[in-house]
């Protein structure tokens, strides 16, 4: 772990874990006491919030299961954000290895027994950090204790190679990031009452990769009883085959083996890495983290480049989401309607022209961008929401609520957004965090009265769900439970008023594929090129991939 900052100041007033449990009010003193020692907080007077930042919840050796943190003697200074876990971001390696810390934010009130929201950041399980949503304003909006978690990423958070399987069955799963998340939830169970949270009312939520992690925990025996409700923001059901993943990892690491003179060719190196012996494990564990962090950095939401969430048979069942056994809790699924737009804007085919603005001056380029954005977005929307619910149908007993955010798609209301990104991947965050970390994208599009009312209601739904597992109350448009009638909540706004209503989304991937086939805005050749190079292999594109895989098999047979 990274260095832990301590304060030598003696604690005059503390609130022990035991005393908080029996107290009727929360002790707002500067220092609290958790299982591992005293901890000093920060006060955000502007947002009326209390923060404990960079708090270590676990320690771990490389590719081993996390363990509880050692107790400390002095007072831990939790007034500064902790280091993020090592990652390759913006073409450079940042962060430190095994930075297993979390942030806690709560309203600056004396209330206790507050709902707890544990949040997992996005970033393809390769990048990102706990400050994706800081919680300073959100904790008060939801009247909850907000916990945001840093966990291991990339090839250090997931690694399926046999040579590393020297521990328990859970440790041998290769799903180290999931083990970190489980450990964070254990920490919450043991310590959250100290911060006025209710350990028996915990909601696990995540965005993007974090949302996919949440979905994976629903079928994981490791997470049984660790939380009470779940929210997946833009996160569908994605898992990886363990043997296929080993091949991909060995191929990715092979150049380092050759560079270090252990094998003469990359093919030899790959075959060597697929063996199971201590020499390989020792080599991998002694590699610099700076050399491992950039691996598979070009994944672009493709599991075929960076496979993770392995169906190992212990942490994740071999049958994946076909299992009959779930951690059956109330579930909320939230998606935008143009989920693929951000990824298209950064795709090598479009990125330069998108950033310069040339794309929007070229009719052909604009048509190619629109085709990829629109159909990719529709497939992605289904994957995040109704398609996930359909896979659970008949096996999952708890209530499922699905919302689809349309705000950003109407050129009469949000002209800049509608012409570029629309209701993009993560647009919900603009409703939850002030100031928004998407300010460069949204400009002033959320400053009108309609967007403000929409955002207020969205937070009210979340607040209700955290409290009871039901997002509804008498002051809100009824959010229907999803069923085989495909009921969802449509969320949008005009400039002057919110536009929130119950709706039906019965569309299927087959319907979208038929639209793509019938689309005449581009030639068949260009469409095929976009389908196979831009849209294929993504988290959401399995229905499209099946078509081209079948065509390739037919060509081989002929």
Describe the role of every protein-language-model region.
Residues 89-90, 170-175, 238-240, 270, ...:
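Active-site rim elements
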Residues 13-174, 443-454, 469-473, 506, ...:
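Non-catalytic accessory segments of hydrolases
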Residues 108-113, 163-179, 183-205:
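Gly/Ser-rich "nucleophile elbow"/oxyanion-hole loop immediately N-terminal to the catalytic nucleophile
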Residues 204, 231-233:
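A short, hydrophobic beta-strand element of the alpha/beta-hydrolase
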Residues 45, 394-558:
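Mobile gating loops/cap/lid regions near enzyme active sites that modulate substrate access
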Residues 2-11:
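Bacterial N-terminal signal peptides
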